Amino acid sequence: MPRRGAVPKREVLPDPVYQSKVLTKLINQVMLKGKKSLAESIVYGAMDIIKEKTGKNPLEVFETAMKNVMPVLEVKARRVGGANYQVPVEVRHDRRQTLAIRWLTNYARERAGKSMKEKLANEIMDAAAGTGGAVKKKEDTHKMAEANKAFAHYRW
């Protein structure tokens, strides 16, 4: 943590094709070893596949997927009197977005075979339909928060 006050958040520029800041964040998450042009081709390729398969605006499908994956609650470890409690806390909007994008890309990478474009497109379409690994991760996170509701009074 810095001693000289809070570090300002860097503003993300909207992507050149869809003019969406969230899509830029997805591109940055997909990017490995600084290869941004490759990450852009993967994401835009996935968007083309989504448009081809669904016949809908790919940005709307992506936004639906994001809504279905963004968690409302998560658990944080809190140490009280020698015991660690999993305390449920609400998730801020920017963290919701970050977690959703991270889960989408991670579960897309874990999918079997094919190119990353196809895997990402399939994960986004599954998330928009309410299925897929990323949606399951959100549901598991919510179940953990629900199971530990008794420790909610330890919030800070």
From Swiss-Prot:
Keyword vocabulary terms for this entry: Ribonucleoprotein, Ribosomal protein, RNA-binding, rRNA-binding, tRNA-binding
InterPro entries: Ribosomal_uS7, Ribosomal_uS7_bac/org-type, Ribosomal_uS7_CS, Ribosomal_uS7_dom, Ribosomal_uS7_dom_sf
PROSITE patterns: RIBOSOMAL_S7 (PS00052)
Single annotated GO MF: rRNA binding
Coiled coil segments of this chain: none
Alphabetized Pfam families for the sequence: Ribosomal_S7 (PF00177)
Gene Ontology CC entries for this record: small ribosomal subunit
A biological-process GO annotation: translation
Function, in words: One of the primary rRNA binding proteins, it binds directly to 16S rRNA where it nucleates assembly of the head domain of the 30S subunit. Is located at the subunit interface close to the decoding center, probably blocks exit of the E-site tRNA.
Subunit structure: Part of the 30S ribosomal subunit. Contacts proteins S9 and S11.
UniProt record similarity statement: Belongs to the universal ribosomal protein uS7 family.
PANTHER family linked: RIBOSOMAL PROTEIN S7
The protein, known as: Small ribosomal subunit protein uS7
Native source species: Pelotomaculum thermopropionicum (strain DSM 13744 / JCM 10971 / SI)
